[in-house]
Amino acid sequence: TFIAIKPDGVQRGLCGEVMKFIQPMKQHYLDLKDMPFYAGLCKYMASGPVFAMVWEGEGIVKMMLGETNPADSKPGSIRGDFCINIGRNIIHGSDTLENAKMEIGLWFKGEEFVAYAEKAKAWVYE
């Protein structure tokens, strides 16, 4: 899953807190271009730095992030603990595997990743 701590999260100094949970922005959000909030979203995302990363884990990343609307997020999730507004929910996570691949390709080059195969994974997951 592609992860980006949004400008409000960076400005609030929450990069470290989020880490404890172990191409241009217009192109990134191109699938939302027909939505009424698109221009405002692009302006907001360009208003400051973002901290981009890639997380991997079966069924855990979305649970750690919480729901898009912080009001629907459980305590113990990033959005449940640090957010109150859907428009400023501090973190982005890809909604599908296909979008994750596209978003990761916008932000990173393939050679920036290290292949890592955890041997115990076969014992934990079928």
Swiss-Prot record:
Instruction: Tell me which SMART domains the record gives.
Output: NDK (SM00562)
**CC terms in the record's Gene Ontology section:** cytoplasm; lamellipodium; nucleus; ruffle
Which cofactors is this protein said to need? Mg(2+)
Q: Name one Pfam family in it.
A: NDK
Q: Where in the cell is it found?
A: Cytoplasm; Nucleus; Cell projection, Lamellipodium; Cell projection, Ruffle
Q: What general EC class does the enzyme of this chain belong to?
A: transferase
Q: Where does ATP bind?
A: 6, 37, 68, 79, 89
GO molecular-function terms, A-Z: ATP binding; metal ion binding; nucleoside diphosphate kinase activity
Q: What is this protein called?
A: Nucleoside diphosphate kinase B
Q: Which organism is it from?
A: Macruronus novaezelandiae
Source organism phylogeny? Eukaryota, Metazoa, Chordata, Craniata, Vertebrata
